[in-house]
Every structure is written in structure tokens, then in C-alpha cells.
Amino acid sequence: MDETRLDKIEIKELEVFANHGVYPEENVLGQKFVISATLFTRTRLAGLTDELSASINYGEVSHMITDLTRKHTYKLLESLAENLAEMLLCSLSGLEKITLKIEKPWAPVGLPLKTVSVEITRKWHTAYIAFGSNMGDKKMYIDNGIRGLAETKGCRIEAISDYLITEPYGVTDQDEFLNGVLKMRTLLTPGELLVRLHQLEQAANRERIIHWGPRTLDLDILFYDQEIIDMPDLHIPHIDLHTRDFVLVPMNQIAPYLRHPVLNQTISQLLDSLLNKSENTAK
């Protein structure tokens, strides 16, 4: 997503009386909160057609913010902000990103101040996940894993490649694999997404005994936006994806023109290079 092409709709200083705070008195007596929201979307179609349905209705958004703020009680402004952002991003079609500022002008600090506030920015991210299985009912394990991911709050599956039967990689003395790739939108951070994938693997009774060994379900993050991450337990883009045909073939099916942020080549180019290398090796 090219954020430079996004337009903005702003809601400034919406006042809501609610009961958030650490102190019990705040939860009982309540106080004023002032909420501002910047909605990042595309207004081009609405501008051309003059149709409200082609845009985001800021009146409805103001009521949604007011309703959640009034009906729920949180100790922290941070919690209120996170829940508001998630609710709006998951509910509003066309909302790609949001900045929320929540002010608490009557905060019980005991000192003269104008206000205290928390400001966050959250957005949809695009991730590509490789999936595979070579034990038991392979398709069932994969289908259940994808379903679990689709049912995760803040996750949407956008495309799934064909399931491919492939030869085992690394340790070759094992059953054939069923492999593929999916494209998703998510509000989860890379670390949170990794944790969720591990939970789904564990739900399929995945055991990590032999490196590259048999597994009921394997879920790996290939790409997360155009981010480059190198941590002990997480490498994005996946460090070996350009050497694996069982990743590049399904990736080429759903995202041939996606560009690798490190190698600066498209998936289609990486696949062509790998196939040419394999042909030359075979000669």
C-alpha cells in the first residue's frame, strides 16, 4: 500500500463523558475525554461521484467512537485507544490507517496542567505466509490452520494459492509435502503474528524434533509489508525463500510482481533465476 496516495478525513476534539481511569472514583464519577481521529482512506471515488457510500461517514464514525468510549471502562488511555483503533479498522470498509489522540483534561494529577493525552497510529499490514504439511491428513491440517488464522481478530485472508505436492526439503527421507502460500491483511505486529502462527502449529500438535523434519503444520512469515527484520527468532523476508521452489511457485501464482525488499527482484524474476539455475545444474 502506497500511503502517499491516501487521503485524510479528520474528526477533531470530539467530547465524550466516560468512566476510564486507574482510580475507582474515576470509574464511578466519570469525566470528560476529548478524542481526535485522522482516518486515512481514498476519497477519489467519492469526490468524483458525490456519493457518501463511496467514502467514510464521519458522522457514523463519531457515534461509533462515542458509543465504545461510553459503554466500556478501561484503566488506561492506551487501552481505550487500542480498542477504538481496532474496532474502527475492522468495521470500516476503506479505512487503511488511523491516528487517534485521546485527551484527558481532568486527569487527577494534582498539578495545574491543560491536558494529558495518548496518541497512536495503527494500520492494516500485508503479509504473505507459507504453509505446509507432510503428516497425516495434510489438507485437513492446512485447512484448519488457515481457518484459525482467518478467525483471528485483526486478520483477513485475501488470497490462497493452489496446494502443491512437493518433494521434502533438507531431510529427504520423509513423506511428500503439501505446500502453498497465502496473502493476508493484519493488524498484528510481526512478533504478534509469529506468536499466533506458533499457536496454530501447536494446535495441530506440531513437534520440533528434527530440523526440516516431518511436521503436521508449518507456517512461516515470508513478507510483512516491505519490512526488513533480523532477530534471533524472526527474519523477514524469510531468509531462504529465494532458494525454494515450493515457496516461489505458489508465491508467483498470487503475487508475481511483489518485489523482494533486499534482493530488489520480483517474485517472478526470483523464480526464473531459480529454475534457470536448476536447469544448468541438471545439464
Describe the residue ranges of each PLM region.
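N-terminal beta1-alpha1 ligand-phosphate binding loop
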Residues: 124-155, 161-165
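Short amphipathic alpha-helices in soluble, non-transmembrane regions
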Residues: 144-148, 193-200
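N-terminal, polar/charged subdomain of small-to-medium soluble alpha/beta proteins
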Residues: 1-129, 133
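Hydrophobic C-terminal alpha-helix "anchor/cap" residues
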Residues: 84, 88-89, 149-150, 197
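Short loop/turn motifs enriched for small/polar and acidic residues
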Residues: 101-105, 163-165, 222-224
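Short, surface-exposed acidic-centric catalytic microdomains
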Residues: 44-59, 151-189
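Flexible, gly/pro- and Lys/Arg-enriched active-site loops
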Residues: 42, 47, 124-126, 169-178, ...
